[in-house]
A protein has these predicted regions:
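Short intrinsically disordered terminal tails
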Residues: 1-6, 71-84
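Negatively charged, low-complexity tracts enriched in Asp/Glu with abundant Ser/Thr
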Residues: 1-25
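Short, intrinsically disordered, low-complexity terminal segments
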Residues: 2-4, 16, 43, 63-66, ...
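Hydrophobic alpha-helical elements and their junctions with loops/disorder across both membrane
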Residues: 14, 26, 73-77
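Acidic, low-complexity, intrinsically disordered interaction modules
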Residues: 20-68, 72
Length: 84
């Protein structure tokens, strides 16, 4: 598996269970002409909130940064819930 495919796999391995647990949706765009982006939302429709936005020129770096952002978001969510 090349670096790009491995980065995508690592992101989805982390993202899928977290998305199911918190009701997340992901939108992404990659292109050879401009920077790629990944946006992750909580909720659906008019009530959805963007919780993560990553932009990166290199697609492999994009997926790696998104993976780190998802992990960080879940950890902060767990900390907030633990304080309640």
């Amino acid at each position: 598996m090349n670096g790009y495919a491995a980065a995508v796999r690592r992101l989805y391995d982390i993202y899928r269970p977290i998305a199911r647990k918190y009701g997340l949706r992901m939108s992404s765009h990659t292109s050879i002409y401009d920077d790629g982006w990944i946006k992750i939302y909580k909720g659906e429709g008019a009530d959805r909130q963007q919780i993560i936005k990553i932009e990166e020129a290199n697609d492999t770096d994009l997926y790696d940064r998104a993976r780190g952002a998802v992990i960080s978001w879940e950890n902060s969510k767990k900390e907030r819930n633990a304080r309640r």
